[in-house]
């Protein structure tokens, strides 16, 4: 037994469990913990988590480009309560808030309801934040400017969107609740998509050489579109797109066949007129604010 004990004592400890090894492992673990603490303290962990959630919500076709754009726009964040980081000039601060709100609103398509509604809330909070010379809350002036920016950036003709803006805008000093903000922004985005679809439809009707369509044909399509919209009892703007999408090829073919059946000469219809009249059908279904 004494010989066995001596042999056991003579066995050297494993190399990984020497005192210096234990110290290096301890230092590495401490460094890892301190790095994690640092990332957590400066907000990087939460920032990355939020960015990944945005990717899951929006499900973009190019996630890397989406993340690059996301982090680029993180620099536009303005202080909520003013302070040393507040840029000089109230106008500059307002433009930054508008830009950031627009960016949030475009992160997800309006058909992704949960993600879009969440982004609407974030945009509303961004515009409602107080500052040195601004009381918390969103006024009609800022809200109306945002709607104009949405329509302008969507490249819709001004004469097409102007009637809608008159319906959904608020007075400059009027307080705008979240429900009105959501309805107005959603309606603008849906109108832009509606006009884009109408433009694609006009391309099928137009004479490419003259860039105009036969008036009888254009009127037949507008009448069919109006019938589809009137048949929809839903008041939600997104449902108007569904109604327009239900224009089956049979109904359109019948309308076009009737239109070209006459032999009387017809005046041309321009793209601008077609889009304006198509948008008017949409806007007629929108309820005015208040």
Curated annotation (Swiss-Prot):
Keywords: Cell projection, Cilium, Cytoplasm, Cytoskeleton, Developmental protein, Differentiation, Flagellum, Microtubule, Phosphoprotein, Spermatogenesis. Signal peptide: none annotated. The keyword Phosphoprotein applies. InterPro entries: DD_TPGS1, TPGS1. GO terms for molecular function: microtubule binding; tubulin-glutamic acid ligase activity. The keyword Lipoprotein does not apply. GO terms for biological process: adult behavior; chemical synaptic transmission; sperm axoneme assembly; vesicle localization. Pfam families: TPGS1_C. Residues 1-30 are annotated as: Disordered. SUPFAM superfamilies: Dimerization-anchoring domain of cAMP-dependent PK regulatory subunit. The modification Phosphoserine is found at residues 34, 266. It is found in: Cytoplasm, Cytoskeleton, Cilium axoneme; Cytoplasm, Cytoskeleton, Flagellum axoneme; Cytoplasm, Cytoskeleton, Cilium basal body; Cytoplasm, Cytoskeleton, Flagellum basal body. Gene3D superfamilies: cAMP-dependent protein kinase regulatory subunit, dimerization-anchoring domain. GO terms for cellular component: axon; centriolar satellite; centrosome; cytoplasm; dendrite; microtubule; microtubule organizing center; motile cilium. It comes from the Eukaryota. Subunit of the tubulin polyglutamylase complex (TPGC). The complex mediates cilia and flagella polyglutamylation which is essential for their biogenesis and motility. May act in the targeting of the tubulin polyglutamylase complex. Required for the development of the spermatid flagellum. Part of the neuronal tubulin polyglutamylase complex which contains TPGS1, TPGS2, TTLL1, LRRC49 and NICN1. Interacts with PCM1, CSTPP1 and LRRC49. This is Tubulin polyglutamylase complex subunit 1.
